[in-house]
UniProtKB/Swiss-Prot annotation:
Protein name: Sex-regulated protein janus-A
Keyword tags: Differentiation, Sexual differentiation
Binding site for substrate: 37, 104-106
Molecular function (Gene Ontology), one example: protein histidine phosphatase activity
Pfam families hit by this protein: Ocnus
Source organism of this protein record: Drosophila orena
Catalytic residue positions: 63 (proton acceptor)
């Protein structure tokens, strides 16, 4: 094999690994209950593939804290991350209820309808409401 063939083979292997890493990223990771900030993150592999995921944690004061924490996780997997927006989530597991609302001052408002669709993949038996009201 010449150098070009070896390089091409190596790049295909890296691309396959990043595709597998992307496939392994959970769509939803949020706090088990309470009211907390969330961000939508577009996770991108080494090629053109990407997926939107939802992250929200009660222990994070700012939307940027959530993004920074998760971006480090994605970097270790060889993935890139972009944040198109955020908001807040009210999570009441006893009532099987989620409410998505508000916006991020730093990132802007996430697409709450898309957030609802993504949350429904993990919480199919929940009532999920969205609102453009509130901060």
């Amino acid at each position: 094999m010449n150098r070009l063939q070896l390089l091409s083979k190596g790049l295909r292997l890296i691309h396959k690994m990043s595709e597998e890493a992307l496939a392994g990223v959970p769509l939803v990771h949020i706090s088990p209950e309470g009211i907390f900030k969330y961000v939508m993150i577009n996770v991108i592999d080494g090629g053109d593939a990407s997926k939107a995921v939802i992250r929200g944690f009660a222990d994070c004061t700012w939307h940027a804290d959530i993004f920074d924490r998760e971006e480090e996780v994605f970097k270790k997997l060889g993935l890139r991350a972009e944040c198109p927006g955020g908001g807040r989530i009210e999570h009441n597991p006893d009532k099987k209820y989620l409410k998505v609302y508000g916006y991020s001052q730093g990132f802007g408002k996430a697409d709450h309808a898309q957030t609802k669709r993504i949350l429904a993949t993990k919480y199919p038996d929940y009532t999920i409401e969205t609102s453009d009201e509130g901060y």
